[in-house]
C-alpha cells in the first residue's frame, strides 16, 4: 500500500496542519494507481448524485442540461439555482411543501433540494406515491439502491446504508468501488447526458469557486462531484474513475491532493491544485500543498 497523500496547511512558512488523503484510480475494474487505503469504506454522500439521477434521466430524455445539473447539485440557494429547482417541481406537479429536505432555512433553499425535486419527478414518472419518498422503505429508494449497486457492480445486499444529512439513504462502498462506479458512468445508459450536463453547467453543482466547478473547468473532458466529509469522485471520458477521501473530512485538502494524484497519471490539471488560505480581508495568508513523494502510482508503490 502506498502512503496516503499528505496535504500541508502552511501559514507564514509554518506547517499548521496536515490532512491525510486516500486516493484510487480504476479503469475496467482494475486499480491503476493508489495512495493510502484504496478499499477504505466510505459513504458516497452527495457524490452519489450523478448516479442517483440516472433513473430520471433515462425516463425523461426531455430534461435539459440545467435541470440535470441541479438534480446533481449541492447548491448554495442562489436565485438561478432555485429557479431551476422550481422548474423541476413544476414538472413533477409538486410544490416546495412536498420536499422532504427539512427546513434549513427553507425546504427549497436546502442544499439538496435539486436532488429531492428530481426524486419527486421520478416518483411521478414511475407512478410511485410521492409522500415518504425519502424513506428507505419507499420503492424509489429501493430503485436507487439497485442503481448504485449496478454502477459499482456489487451486490445491493452488501451495501451498508445510513441516513444522509437531507434525510434520504446514503450508501457505503469501498473507495475503489466508488471510483469503479464513476469509471463506468460514461458507458451507462443516461450517463453521457449526466456528464454533458455537469460539464455544461459546473457552477450549478455548488458555486463557481467550488472544487467541483474548478475541476470541470480545469480538467478537460472530465466530470466530478464532491460529497460531505471529504469525498470526491470523478471520471474521464474514456473510462478512468478516481475517488479521494480525506481522513478527517476536511474538504479543503481535496484540490491539492486531487491535482497531485492526477498528475501522477499524466492528467493536466491547470490551476486545480492552487489552494490558498485567506483572512477576513480577502488577503492571501497561506496555502495548501502536498508533501513531496507522498503519492505514487500503483506501479511504483512502495510496499
Name what the model sees in each region.
Residues 19-20, 34-51, 66-69:
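Short active-site loop at a secondary-structure junction
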Residues 1-39:
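Beta-lactamase-like hydrolase cores
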